[in-house]
């Protein structure tokens, strides 16, 4: 018996989904986030065709026609409330970033040995583990991310590299961290007082 060649079914392709550059949701769901206006502006610039299908006068009128008058009022109130909440959260984050400092401490371990401890990078949205690894490669020394007693993350780099770390941070992450928010601190161990005989 001869086998009949059966057509191979075409492999189904995954659908290409566009994600918003502001809130990372699909544009159809941006209205449920707090950054609807920014999302709308991003969509207008990045994908004008999709913007027309979602935010054109016809699309908005057809969506509003299905709602009752009271539902329209509630939707408008909810949208205004969400926008105000998002604006307040954004202002709070900006204020917190402006007030926070990245501290680079030079800590003495023994007589001649020092470590450099960096704190405050997580406020700027930077990954401490990645930065610790990059610092270890850059300065060819041991570098690790640890949690301090206060529960904050800190990066410990072996050696006295505090000035170099500041320069490197400004070079690599200068857009995120302003120079005025980086402070160098020298932390010396207190010498034990000897008792008088």
UniProtKB/Swiss-Prot annotation:
It comes from the Eukaryota. It is found in: Cytoplasm. It holds the Pfam family DENR_N. Interacts with the 40S ribosomal subunit. One of its GO terms (cellular component) is cytoplasm. Keywords: Cytoplasm, Ribonucleoprotein, Ribosomal protein. One of its GO terms (biological process) is formation of translation preinitiation complex. Its main location: cytoplasm. The keyword RNA-binding does not apply. One of its GO terms (molecular function) is translation initiation factor activity. This is Translation machinery-associated protein 22. PANTHER family: DENSITY-REGULATED PROTEIN, DENSITY-REGULATED PROTEIN HOMOLOG. The SUI1 domain may be involved in RNA binding. Belongs to the DENR family. Residues 102-173 form the SUI1 domain.
């Amino acid at each position: 018996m001869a086998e009949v060649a059966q057509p191979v079914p075409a492999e189904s392709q995954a659908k290409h989904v566009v994600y918003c550059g502001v809130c990372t949701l699909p544009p159809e769901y941006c209205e449920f986030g707090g950054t609807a206006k920014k999302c709308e502006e991003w969509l207008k610039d990045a994908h004008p065709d999709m913007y027309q299908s979602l935010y054109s006068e016809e699309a908005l009128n057809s969506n509003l026609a299905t709602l009752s008058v009271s539902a329209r009022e509630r939707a408008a109130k909810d949208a205004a409330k969400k926008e105000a909440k998002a604006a307040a959260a954004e202002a709070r984050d900006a204020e917190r970033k402006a007030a926070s400092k990245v501290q680079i401490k030079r800590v003495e371990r023994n007589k001649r040995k020092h470590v450099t401890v960096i704190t405050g990078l997580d406020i700027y949205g930077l990954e401490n583990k990645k930065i610790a690894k990059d610092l270890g490669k850059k300065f060819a020394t041991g570098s690790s991310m640890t949690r301090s007693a206060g529960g904050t993350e800190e990066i410990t780099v072996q050696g006295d590299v505090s000035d170099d770390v500041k320069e490197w941070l400004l070079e690599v992450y200068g857009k995120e961290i302003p120079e005025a928010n980086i402070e160098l601190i020298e932390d010396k161990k207190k010498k034990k007082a000897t008792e008088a005989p």
